[in-house]
Amino acid sequence: MIKFIAAMCAGLALISSLAHADDAAVRVERISVDSPALAGNPEGNSARRDVIVVLPPSYASSPARRYPVVYALHGYGITPEKWFAMDKQDQIAARAFRNGVREMILVFPDTYTRHHGSMYSTSATTGDWEAFITRDLVGYIDAHYRTIANRASRGLMGHSMGGYGTVRLGMKYPGTYSSLYAMSACCLAAREITPEQGRQIEAVKTMEQASAAPFMVRTTLTAAAAWSPNPNKPPFYVDLPYEGGQLRPHVLAEWAANAPLAMLPQYVNHLRQYQAIAIDVGNRDSLVDDDRALHEALDRFGIANTFEVYDGDHGSGVVSRFETKVLPFFSRHLQF
């Protein structure tokens, strides 16, 4: 539970651009993508999703050239706009390209929900976020940008909840991506809920109360919306792990079935199809043991991967490593 809380700390395009006169600069486009996979979800999350696209320096000047694509998944409680405001991914990408990283397109989809995060899961309550990312978004980007439209030229990465999404989607959709990079992936192991935590969660009756609730309560509702949905049970449309003070083991079993450490043995053959898999985590991150366990599980099944523990906490290495580790990783492993 402590680890979880610490970790959780294609359609019409409407384009607005930030263009630079300097040919060495990247171009940022803000678009909207309509997702049939998300339409009509009971939670009320919009099926029109904001997406930030970073185009490499030569994109405008080389109209015949096509590029590989890296899809970048954000963490819990933020959007791509907030991620850009904090970390300046466009500036990071521009520096990386100047320093020899091969040019690629970067795509940052918004998966923020009423409970602050989609968990990149398929849910009868929140919508089919797996299909949005792997089908609707990829299809839109391939149709509207000069991509190299095959799995060998697609990568997937993410941090925290986005790291979880990278592992989850990577396991299930090897036909879409060829390389994976998970940064400080959260939620890899099955969750547990104490009776006291169960009482706190049961006390929340409205969305307004949920928004003002302690972090643990909010993240638990996020997990329930993703992994134990119940579209016939308003206002949250979820099954909770405690009801009337009694533990409901089947709900925890549903959550455990969505934990990558439990899922991995089912997807060994899928994971063996990847060109490259990388995992990193800070030595002061509460997730370090679970991320190491993922690396060790991959090793046990003979799935090639690289694993690095660096000096840092949950968020301290994201900016520097996106430039010096993540983008060079895809530069080496994607097909250009």
What do these predicted ranges mean?
Residues 6-16:
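Bacterial N-terminal signal peptides
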Residues 1-4:
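Positively charged n-region of N-terminal signal peptides that target proteins for export
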Residues 20-336:
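Non-catalytic cap/lid and distal C-terminal segments of serine-dependent acyl enzymes
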